[in-house]
Amino acid sequence: SEMCIRDRYLTEMSNIAIKWGGTIDKFIGDAILVFFGDPKTKGKEEDAVSCVSMAMEMLEKLNSLRITWRKKGLAKPLNARIGIHTGVCTVGNFGSEDRLDYTIIGNGVNLASRLETSSEVNKILLSEDTYLLVRNKIACKKKKSINVKGISYPVQTYEVSGFLDLNKNLFEKNIPGLSLSLDKTEIEDNESAIKLLSDVLKKLKSSNNK
């Protein structure tokens, strides 16, 4: 039944969140709010890497569940979108005198939610704050900026591709003025890609000669 599928999904995702050190805040329908850094933290960078690693494992697990459900005749298996942001939030017991919940609040939570809704299906979308913390270990593709209520500037986003050291098809480097992101699995014409890189090199060389 639909209820059994959702329960199985939430159970599997919760187990993965706990494995990576995440704190499960709440379930909202078939969505899960997870945060890192409280009550224990490994530091901003490691917390961010753990969170993205958790998200990648969640999508892998969901894919295997989807295969199982299809074999059982489920026509429309579950899909997921994941949004991740790193920032300052308030964590504690909030609520009324009769009922308190240990939860996280703040603009960062709203931004993560906006990233989730802006993500493509079965993809992970990061804010630039998270990307800057994980870019040495996680390959990402630069995506469009999004406007978020309560934030006065467009938020640059990045889509997760995989671990840099485990995926030889991915390459991503950034220096001031130059951002290079390569995914060999998506290149259909190597000659066109080589020509593009050659044109960029010519422009760089010509600027040095001026």
Specify the residue positions occupied by each region the protein language model found.
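A short pre-motif secondary-structure segment
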Residues: 24-26
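Active-site loop/short helix in cyclic nucleotide turnover domains
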Residues: 1, 17, 36-42, 90-95
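Alpha-helical scaffold within the catalytic cores of cyclic-nucleotide enzymes
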Residues: 7-22, 38-82, 86, 107-109, ...
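Short beta-strand/turn "edge" motifs
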Residues: 29-33
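Intrinsically disordered, glycine/charged-rich C-terminal tails and inter-domain linkers
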Residues: 79, 121-210
